[in-house]
Amino acid sequence: MTPVGMDRKSLSLLILIVLLGLCIRLQNFGEIFDSRIYYYGYDPYYHMRLVEAIVLEGYRPSFDYYINYPYGLRIDWLPLFDYILAFPGLFLGFWASEIFAVVFPVIIGVLCIVLVYLISLEVLRNEKFALISAFIFSVCPVTVWKSLLGKADHHIWVVFLLLLSIWLVTKPGLLKLLSGIPMLLMALSWLGAPIYAALLAVSSLFQFNEKEVRIVGISNLIPVLSSIQNLFLGFSFLAIAVFLLVGSFVKRFERRFRYAIVYYLCICSVALLSAYLMPVGWLGFVKSGISYVLGTDIYLPTIREARSFQILGVISSAGYLFFVLAIPALFMLRNGFLKVFFVLSFLISILQLRFVEVLAFPVAILASYTICQILERVDYPVFRKEEEGESKRRGRKEKKKAVEIRKKDHATVIAFLLFLALPCFANSLAPVEMTMDWKEALNWMKENLEAQDYLKAYEKPDYAVLSWWDYGNWILYVAKKAVVCNNFQAGADDAAKFFTAQSEEEAMKIVEKRKVRYVVTVEELTVKPETNKTKFIPIMQIAGYSPEYMKNKEIIDFFNKTMLYKLHVENATNLTHFRLLKNFGTVKIFEVK
């Protein structure tokens, strides 16, 4: 046995699962470490902009004139994640933070696999069950995407803290109190922390006894300390703590009133809805939280990960066949926490696709349980000890002859699991969004456009670059130039109006308002008859049009009259105030004359 109580065989298998998860997450190594370090996605580039300021300037900006130019924007991202990435750079230089930011999500992703294994052990105390759970989680597409090499975003960090809290909650006695510490760290890293804390709180009511629920409630007083950073967060966690403490009192009546907790949840839901509808200023944190979950913001429907009612997207992101296999376990496994957590995380994933990251955890464990039951029924012992040399089937077949487990049986089980995981492997492949054309364009802009004092976030620069908001953080971090809009969506309305403008005069009003000197366009913004893949539809929506009520031909006709068409397709040949400055294939840079 190993020091942690695992036999060597189980430890070896866990290491193999971790190595498999590690290999999948290193898939983009060559694209990340190119001529310089690049990151995966869009938001990581603004995190690194903040990290660079921390390391080189000694402060983290709370306001930035280099986005939403020329007005600037307050930075509402919470600081802990950026300080974690900045930590090695404070001692070794910014290069250390650049490398650390690349590998950090992979490290955290691997630790999440181990945590799922540990949580599964707390659920059933069965090594095989826990190993299969860890395997499923390691290949789950959404967990891979969130922890890819170079994905320097807070998502996998938040998932790790949630899993750590859940593991501590499943521990006996006062260890449950410690679950509030990861929640505090989450509250210092992400404004949506109360959403995941609420999932854990409601699920706890259906699993633990009165005393245990009370301890979990007290643990939620620890993240109330986050009110030092943000009052909204402090009030939210205080409300969750009160919810659990009152819930522990309600648990007393469960023997007399079977559905006491259900009634209690209904009352709390009505109270929450009333707070949302009441025109009371100090309840604004409730309204903003519910609005965030419901995705009522005008920009959210145009963001891929914030789309609603993407049921197939939720199922595929959570593991395809593993999601389907998780459903029977809802009726077989006697664990209220997992069942409720699965249902709640599925519901919020339907509201916004981004929340599927927390659905992966219950899917992995529930699917593992179903698979284990299937293996039991084909005489492969999972919940029975192999050393007993006897098949202990339920019902009338308890005295059946012993089943000899051979190596080929283990190989068959492994092949079966890999077969179930094939769709996950295929869906987990995620090439870096920044193409070679973009890399060349951004580096050319950095070297050839008028220099700006990029690290002086509080000082307004002379001009801005206008592109679609998807690419704002790239232009800001790599090219070191101010932008009209970035992934915060501030300024996106003016960018959309510019690209959809039907005349040069109309477009110039935006240019003058935003002090734009350069415009960057890219092929994927345009509309082509042979494909429906375009970002022009959300551009139209944000500009105030309704493409959902237009036929494809009408959209094409509309596009052919826009500034985006006149710039990217016609290369500004028929425009007076714009000229093509540089062409990088799919990416083009225009100068305002």
Swiss-Prot record:
Q: What class of enzyme is it?
A: transferase
Motif DKi motif per UniProt: ranges: 524-539
Q: How does this protein lie in the membrane? A: Multi-pass membrane protein
Q: Where are the residues marked Important for catalytic activity as a site?
A: 146
Q: Where is this site: Interacts with target acceptor peptide in protein substrate?
A: 43, 305, 535
EC number, UniProt record: 2.4.99.21
Cofactor(s) the protein needs: Mn(2+); Mg(2+); Zn(2+)
- What's the family? Belongs to the STT3 family.
The entry's protein name is Dolichyl-phosphooligosaccharide-protein glycotransferase 2
Residues of the region (Interacts with target acceptor peptide in protein substrate) are: 468-470
Residues annotated as binding a glycophospholipid are 154, 354
Q: Where are the transmembrane segments?
A: 13-33, 99-119, 129-149, 155-175, 181-201, 230-250, 266-286, 311-331, 333-353, 355-375, 412-432
- What is this protein for, i.e. what is its function? Oligosaccharyl transferase (OST) that catalyzes the initial transfer of a defined glycan (a GalNAc-linked heptasaccharide composed of 4 Hex, 3 dHex and a sulfate for A.fulgidus AglB-S) from the lipid carrier dolichol-monophosphate to an asparagine residue within an Asn-X-Ser/Thr consensus motif in nascent polypeptide chains, the first step in protein N-glycosylation.
Q: List, in alphabetical order, the Gene Ontology terms for molecular function in this entry.
A: metal ion binding; oligosaccharyl transferase activity
Is Cell membrane one of the keywords UniProt gives this record? yes
Gene that this sequence comes from: aglB2
Pathways involved = Protein modification; protein glycosylation
Record motif DXD motif 1, residues: 41-43
Q: Which organism is it from?
A: Archaeoglobus fulgidus (strain ATCC 49558 / DSM 4304 / JCM 9628 / NBRC 100126 / VC-16)
Q: Which residues bind Mn(2+)?
A: 43, 153, 155
Q: The motif TIXE motif: which residues?
A: 302-305
